[in-house]
Amino acid sequence: MKRLLSLIFLVFVFFAVMLTPPALAGDAAAGKTVFTAKCAQCHLGGKNLVNPAKTLSKADLEANGMASLDAIITQVTNGKAAMPAFGKLLTAEQIENVATYVLAQAEADWK
């Protein structure tokens, strides 16, 4: 009986860990400050004034392969298409914070 309870407990812990969303690495509050100063001109409220089909909504990020911290960091750092590179304008920490903020806002549907 003790083994069965131990097994059930371990299975429960395993699934609890596996179903917990990963913590975001950066500081979303600091990212909001940078986003407001550097990104909101084109991406206010998660929109995209240059290419309205590629917003910062969770669905669009997923559809465009951008729903990860690494993908957003890479695009902000290097730029892509009409989006300029910010790698020389922002520190790596600022870029990570912006990416964290964008993912958090996408999860909250930019509310």
Swiss-Prot record:
Under the cellular component aspect of Gene Ontology, which terms does the record hold? plasma membrane-derived thylakoid lumen
Cite a single GO MF annotation. heme binding
What does its PTM field state?
A: Binds 1 heme c group covalently per subunit.
Q: What is the top-level taxon of the source organism?
A: Bacteria
Subcellular localization(s) per the UniProt record: Cellular thylakoid lumen
Q: Which UniProt keywords apply?
A: Electron transport, Heme, Iron, Metal-binding, Photosynthesis, Signal, Thylakoid, Transport
What biological processes does GO assign it? photosynthesis
PROSITE patterns from the entry?
CYTC
From the UniProt annotation, give the residues forming the signal peptide: 1-25
Principal subcellular localisation of the protein: other
**SUPFAM superfamilies with a match to the protein in the record:** Cytochrome c
Q: Where does heme c bind?
A: 39, 42-43, 83
Q: Which Gene3D superfamilies match?
A: Cytochrome c-like domain (1.10.760.10)
The Swiss-Prot or TrEMBL record describes its family as follows: Belongs to the cytochrome c family. PetJ subfamily.
Q: Any idea what job this protein has?
A: Functions as an electron carrier between membrane-bound cytochrome b6-f and photosystem I in oxygenic photosynthesis.
On assembly, the entry states:
Monomer.
This protein's name: Cytochrome c6
Q: Which organism is it from?
A: Rippkaea orientalis (strain PCC 8801 / RF-1) (Cyanothece sp. (strain PCC 8801))
Its gene?
petJ
